[in-house]
């Protein structure tokens, strides 16, 4: 017998035990060791054993002894999975079950299924005589699993061979293959990507004659090629439109006419009227325009003319006449005339400015002018800044807005915030000062600004201008507010009788300053609401009803269904029955809802007459 076992298992039978009973595992290991069965691994659950068998570090195992109750608790057929996938025989261990260990329901049905389909079942504790013949069961099961796998392979191969013999059932369709390859052109021209299409006909790949079904095979690649060509055309058209949309627009300096005419004007390079990108007098286009010579052309085109009148006015005239012409401007105004005649008509556009623009134009010296030609003279005027907004960082207002904005004088009353019932609050601020700077300035130097709901008198207590000791410009919002000043005086010691000690009395001026100091509440603070919150915090013994705490859908009190005679007896004893004669629901506790007190800590405090206390 030993020789037969050694012929099947030369290195001995290697076994895995799956059981959570440590005592049973030690006993089984000792029994199997006497029979030269090596226990190489033990696990407490079927899932852990399956994970170990499916891992990377798998030891050679020839049989698995598994407690059937561990398979029931795992929820899957451990034997079927292991034997079909790993081809390792699984033998179930069945122990004597106590009454508390009995299974029922679906677990009982699953246990019966496992026992009916089991390969071999051994009762616990293990019998050495029975385990001595275990190697025969393992060898026979391994042989059956190998034969079953070979039969399945042969069956699949036979099914495939029959299909190969029957040419009518199998239809093999060979379609031409289209290979796409993305390449980049190295030569000149467009550097866009193009598709190289290689059409290969599988039917003619083996033979070079190209015979057999040429019409049908050639039609498919043609349609594919046409389809791809149309898609490429749409792609190129779309990208051409996109490229045209993002092209650089033609600027005025690129005009050939300007490149040819600008060198003949002899304009200084620092002239602001000279366009960027113009070419010099040595240009070929300029020489062709000037008659083939690089010298100055006799054509003289005046750019603009300017004359100063005796009454302090400035006249700027744009015309096509080469000689300067005198135009009479209105009194104390500046006129800009755009016309093509020597005399200014009545309908010319007249743009009037205040004396600021006039003085800027009058102060330009004639010595700074640059001569363009014998009859044209240009004066360099100081550039005026352009202002767009009324705030301080945007500069002073333009002269045209002086008549539309009323500035508050520096010696005016401080900023006030008035609010009438039913109207939007009106805030008066000096011109050019942002509101946010005003709000920040009220708290920058430690003072509290007036609240939104403050009266006019309270807001007037925070002056921000006309402070003689501030040493800053009048009207600045960042000046610290002028609040009541307090002075520290020497305390006056007043005797309060013999042996009673001394008391400290503040000075009269300090008392008066404290009395006269306004009470500045914090902004957006409602005193009535603060007082109401403080009153609510002082209250104690807050009472709530049970319905308000539990909600309408919560049923705390258990209801008991009693019969008619029991209901009558219970009603006489406790006085709590709803309807003793007809039967109904009775409250199980001998207390009412008024006996339950809810304190402010949300804890239920019951009286001594709770259920069962009597």
Curated annotation (Swiss-Prot):
Post-translational modification: Two-component system major event consists of a His-to-Asp phosphorelay between a sensor histidine kinase (HK) and a response regulator (RR). In plants, the His-to-Asp phosphorelay involves an additional intermediate named Histidine-containing phosphotransfer protein (HPt). This multistep phosphorelay consists of a His-Asp-His-Asp sequential transfer of a phosphate group between first a His and an Asp of the HK protein, followed by the transfer to a conserved His of the HPt protein and finally the transfer to an Asp in the receiver domain of the RR protein.
Keyword Transmembrane helix: no
Keywords noted in UniProt: Activator, Cytokinin signaling pathway, Nucleus, Phosphoprotein, Two-component regulatory system
Matching Gene3D superfamilies: 3.40.50.2300
Disruption outcome: Low fertility.
Keyword Protein transport: no
GO cellular component terms given for this protein: cytosol; nucleus; protein-DNA complex
A GO term for molecular function: transcription cis-regulatory region binding
InterPro entries given in the database record: ARR-like (IPR045279), CheY-like_superfamily (IPR011006), Sig_transdc_resp-reg_receiver (IPR001789)
One GO-annotated biological process of the protein: regulation of DNA-templated transcription
Region Disordered: start-end pairs: 200-220
Modified residues (4-aspartylphosphate): 67
Domain of life: Eukaryota
Subcellular location: Nucleus
Domain Response regulatory: 14-139
PROSITE patterns: RESPONSE_REGULATORY
Compositional bias (Gly residues): 205-217
Family: Belongs to the ARR family. Type-B subfamily.
Protein purpose: Functions as a response regulator involved in His-to-Asp phosphorelay signal transduction system. Phosphorylation of the Asp residue in the receiver domain activates the ability of the protein to promote the transcription of target genes. May directly activate some type-A response regulators in response to cytokinins.
Protein name (Swiss-Prot/TrEMBL): Two-component response regulator ORR33
Organism: Oryza sativa subsp. japonica (Rice)
